[in-house]
Amino acid sequence: MNIKKVGNVILAVKDIDKSLQFYHEIIGLPIKNQRRSWIDLGTTGALLSLHPASLTAQHVGDSIDSGITLGFLVGDVQSAVDELKEKGVTIHRDIIEKDAGKNAIILDPDGYLISLFEPIFDDKDQQTGGYQGFTPA
């Protein structure tokens, strides 16, 4: 097997319109491709793909049950949390600070956990390596 990169992360969602509003209008991810039952969001790297749960395997619980957490790097986690609170987004865990940076956890409309991470290490675009100690729950 010769995997080149992660292409997308697919979320089975209960209401694709509500999820599109959350990820596009509230979070700010641009729409890359949109079809009737599939939406790709993002610009570079892996895409976030939304697909109706009714057209996939049975939707079983939330991300705590399934172990799924989405991670977004942010420039300023405090301003991100403040903005999302104003937009009515559920803050699952407020900001904590560790050696690697600051982190908060929010919930999407289907209960998926989303980590907002502001790194303090040199490579500000680094996706991993700085999450030690940041458990979602």
Question: What are these regions, as identified by a protein language model?
Answer:
Residues 7-21:
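Short, basic/low-complexity N-terminal boundary segments at the transition from targeting/disordered tails
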Residues 18-19, 77-81:
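Short, conserved charged micro-motifs
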Residues 12, 71-75:
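Short hydrophobic/aromatic beta-strand micro-patches
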Residues 1-7, 30-71, 81-107, 118-137:
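Vicinal oxygen chelate
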Residues 19-24, 84, 111:
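Conserved active-site tyrosine of GNAT-family acetyltransferases
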